[in-house]
């Protein structure tokens, strides 16, 4: 069996390369760096009076130091002339320090007044700018409201016009219909009136004819009755005269009655025929 070769240095070097290639192929999730938020520390707000006092103290110390330096230089020069090198410091007097403080206070008050004036001017300018902005906004709102009102008024006017037009059209249509209906009714009424007039005329003519026929019939009947009565009287007279001819007289009476009845039937038929003629015309 062949022995395996021990892993040399070359093999040891190749392994990490392979691992690095594999790792490079892998996607590494990128985590964004989270920066710690700065916490706002509570700072003491210095008042104007504190600031004024600090400025006055620092300025007084600076003036006192300059005066001390000037005194030291003079003494040094005098001692140098005399061959001595002693340095003597002249203490600053309290009066000078107080004067310097007062001067610094006056300067600070003047500066503070100027600052106050500047701040007040800035505040006024800001207020004026705000007022102007508000006025501009109000003007824009007013213009927008006016435009909306104008648009609404125009729309309402259009609706009114359309409504009026529709109402006028409806009225015209209704009037036209009524006129047409009235005309039709009038024409129908005229036709009906004419028909009624014709019927009345026909009735009147028929009534007149009937009256005339009735009168004629009455006259005829009266004439017949008179004739019958006269004949009866004559017969009675003849009976009285002739006594024996009663049978003949009775026969004659029967014949006369039959003739009269036949005539009456003929007249009734003629009257019925006359009445039927105007009805057929209607």
Curated annotation (Swiss-Prot):
Stretches with biased composition (Basic residues): 37-46
Cellular component aspect of the GO annotation: chromatin; mitochondrion; nucleoplasm; nucleus
Cross-link (Glycyl lysine isopeptide (Lys-Gly) (interchain with G-Cter in SUMO1)): 101
Cross-link (Glycyl lysine isopeptide (Lys-Gly) (interchain with G-Cter in SUMO2)): 67, 101, 124
Gene Ontology molecular functions: chromatin binding; nucleosomal DNA binding; RNA binding
Gene Ontology BP terms: chromatin organization; negative regulation of apoptotic process; positive regulation of cell population proliferation; positive regulation of DNA-templated transcription; positive regulation of gene expression; regulation of DNA-templated transcription
Region described as Disordered: 1-282
Bias (Basic and acidic residues): 81-119, 139-152, 158-256, 271-282
PTM sites of type Phosphoserine: 93
Biased composition (Acidic residues): 125-138, 257-270
Location(s), subcellular: Nucleus
Tissue: Ubiquitously expressed.
Keyword Cell cycle (UniProt): no
Modified residues (Phosphotyrosine): 76
Phosphothreonine: residues carrying this PTM: 31
Residues annotated as signal peptide: none
Keywords, sorted A to Z: Chromatin regulator, DNA-binding, Isopeptide bond, Nucleus, Phosphoprotein, Transcription, Transcription regulation, Ubl conjugation
Function text: Preferentially binds to euchromatin and modulates cellular transcription by counteracting linker histone-mediated chromatin compaction.
Comment, domains: Specifically targeted by its C-terminus to nucleosomes in euchromatin.
Family stated for the protein in its record: Belongs to the HMGN family.
Record-given protein name: High mobility group nucleosome-binding domain-containing protein 5
Organism of this sequence: Homo sapiens
